[in-house]
């Protein structure tokens, strides 16, 4: 088998390089599509071991990336997304173990029926082919996307952000080691070996039919560019302008815990809450404690004059705040006229990502879960559960906010399509 090119420094014929990588990925995809589960799992087990054994090397590479980004004056949220720790590397390896253990989606018969003429028809899961993943800052996407692609029988082309270049290479080395040990083509998981941003445009072109789908993981500008320029299908991962609505039927202690976790556990992740909505009927008793728990945890709260009267530490809110994904310890807050008011606000400003209601009123919860148009809706739980690992998928390649093919956490099963197998006994059509 032909190995993909390694890291390239200096001048390079980028279009030729990318086309070569695309062709190699296509060749690898044909092998993976028919690879037995045992062989894929052998590679995954080896990848998990390699991540654990090489944790120090990954941390060293990441430290260089982080130092470079800090020197450039990046935000704390950006640095948090980029930073790897021993715990995060262990979680990465744990995620690979979960993916190893889940059922192989390839070849699964999802439906079977017999026609009156005796023919049997089966709908069977099949890989998509070659998946291009374009991401920013989060080096763990290298492992998540690579192993999910492998489990689902797809080749993956990864183009990480230039800020995480060293970290991604260190993780990718571990994945390639696993592919070698299982005698699978190294091009099954390809990391674009240059920082040149022009590589993104070439991937979006489809590389002469060698890329079947693009998954963007990054900020609003990246996703907008991908959706505007891509000549292949896109699994859109839009910004997470996520809301927590505290209903009149909420338990205050529960609401405080959920709101605090949803915003402050990790403010930079896409599942972080960006807006707090409080039912006017609950505001007199609940609003002050909710604002206080956020502000005293280091969160900046932005609200209107009504909010500022309740707590003078609240900063003024602007119209653009309602549609902003801060990625920082900042939250916009608003009192709404009950469930109807919350639904109207979310419909206007939400990004169809993740929305939560806190209430003991089952009827209100049922209506919220039914009427909110989002990939993930939660009742009495933090928005930070918007994560493939928390859904039992092991990892995710992204949170798809569109409505076609995949929606919500995109795991191994969502990276497959299907075909129909028809079994006959000589039938001809009259």
From Swiss-Prot:
A GO molecular-function annotation: NADP binding
Pathway: Amino-acid biosynthesis; L-proline biosynthesis; L-glutamate 5-semialdehyde from L-glutamate: step 2/2
One GO BP: L-proline biosynthetic process
One Pfam family in the UniProt entry: Aldedh
InterPro entries named in the record: Ald_DH/histidinol_DH, Ald_DH_C, Ald_DH_N, Aldehyde_DH_dom, G-glutamylP_reductase_CS, Glu-5-SA_DH, GPR_dom
A GO cellular component annotation in the UniProt record: cytoplasm
UniProt KW keywords: Amino-acid biosynthesis, Cytoplasm, NADP, Oxidoreductase, Proline biosynthesis
Catalysed reactions, as listed in the record: L-glutamate 5-semialdehyde + phosphate + NADP(+) = L-glutamyl 5-phosphate + NADPH + H(+)
Enzyme Commission number(s): 1.2.1.41
Subcellular locations according to the entry: Cytoplasm
Function summary: Catalyzes the NADPH-dependent reduction of L-glutamate 5-phosphate into L-glutamate 5-semialdehyde and phosphate. The product spontaneously undergoes cyclization to form 1-pyrroline-5-carboxylate.
Entry's family note: Belongs to the gamma-glutamyl phosphate reductase family.
Name the record gives this protein: Gamma-glutamyl phosphate reductase
Organism the protein comes from: Rhodopseudomonas palustris (strain BisA53)
Lineage: Bacteria, Pseudomonadati, Pseudomonadota, Alphaproteobacteria, Hyphomicrobiales
Gene of this entry: proA
